[in-house]
Amino acid sequence: MTSPLQGEDRRFDSAPAHHSRRKQKMLGQNFLIDDNIANKIVNLASIKDDEKILEIGPGRGILTDILVKKGKLLAVEKDKWLAVVLKQKFSEEAEIIEADILDFEIPDIDVIVANLPYSISSPILFRLFKYKWERAVLMFQEEFANRLVAKPGSKTYGRLSVMANHYVETKKLFKVSKTAFQPQPKIHSQVVQLISRKPDYVLDDFTTFEEVVRSIFTHRRKKIRNCLKLNFKDIEFDDLEHMDERAEVLEPREIAELSNKIFAIKSK
């Protein structure tokens, strides 16, 4: 049986204690230490020989160590000290960039693999949606993953579910115990597959769509009519569909259709 710490590069153990505490506090970073989980994540990415891979926040390099054997790897690490050690270990096999992924201009990529920092999972995810890539296998905090993949009618279905659905098809792959990390988080994690695709609807105005989604899910227990009135004060909603329903029951396509009708009224 493989030990969770087997394969861990001992150079990372020399990190000053204050550095580790600072990184955890600033980035919400919990390092994966289970080699079996790391291998499972990479295998599920189904990487082909000629594909270009992006890893975000490689940390101590447990995924990096496997990914460099799979294809052309670009790893982006924000933490200066970790980036230095990663470059020492992987510079001949991968391109290691010290940068904040939220500011980094992502080149053409086929596959994304990452254990994302819990505290900034959402901004990173929507940053990725601005770029072209085929698929991703990402690890999130379990609660975030549940909201990401949620379907209409479920308690976790909301703004995140609808907006992510505009860009990708999501699927839960497997749960990861909190014991697979160092430091150990308070809750479990979930690995999710994302496949890029176009939505099954056409939007007349994306900004209006964002506004509608935000409006109807901010007060999710209110009727849609009452939610929209708070943000679209000059629009009469009586002739629109779904006004007496709650947002949690609408399909993304139905929300898009509602958004298009509101945009048409605004444009008159």
Which ranges hold each PLM region?
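Catalytic cores of RNA-modifying enzymes
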Residues: 21-215, 253-264
